[in-house]
Amino acid sequence: LAHTRLDVGGAFGKTKEAPYLAMNPNALVPTLEEEDGFILWESNTIVRYLAAKHDKAGALEPKDLKARAIASQWMDWQLSVVGPAITPVFWGLIRTPVEKRDMAAIKAGIEKTTAAMQMLEAQLARPPFVAGDAFSYGDIPVGCMCYGFRHPVPDRPAMPNMDRWYAAISARKPFHDAIGGIPLT
């Protein structure tokens, strides 16, 4: 999709400034603003919206109600289970200087994230993607969390199903350009 990316949040700041807060009172990223002034925040909501609006072929939003529910289930799992587990890992290993790291919190986060990823590993033993035989919007946010787990976590257990799936989604140019090809910072 044609878009303009504005770097906001983290080292770029701006999320606490009045213009941004008017769009997203949470002061978090991402925020989608369309040319007509429509504003939407929350990552998974934005993914679902863009798929519904632009994916006329139905390649991202499963047409089958049950497959669509499974895709949404994994999106919500990413948000409610993986996100809280991986946050101390990401912040601890990527954003915190070595001398200031809380290794106990990082270790606990790695254990929780690993347990969650083992659920994904089991799911991917059956279909090739989280919601079935085809890539869907459910794979996008889960893939983002996998990227955050695979790269900084030392000595993670073997997860061949997840590795196969991650290789498949990473081979997709949009995923590579937006996620996999960008260093964690």
Where are the language model's segments positioned?
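GST-like domain detector, emphasizing the conserved glutathione-binding G-site
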Residues: 1-107, 111
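Short, solvent-exposed turn/loop segments enriched in Gly/Ser/Thr/Pro and often Arg
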Residues: 9, 137, 182
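Phosphate-coordinating loops and pocket residues in cytosolic domains that bind phosphorylated ligands
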Residues: 22, 62, 171, 180-181
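Residue-level recognition of oxygen-bearing side chains
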Residues: 45, 161, 174
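Active-site-flanking alpha-helical
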Residues: 51, 145-146, 179
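GST-like fold's C-terminal all-alpha helical module
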Residues: 63-66, 74-171
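Terminal-tail/helix-coil boundary detector
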Residues: 175-185
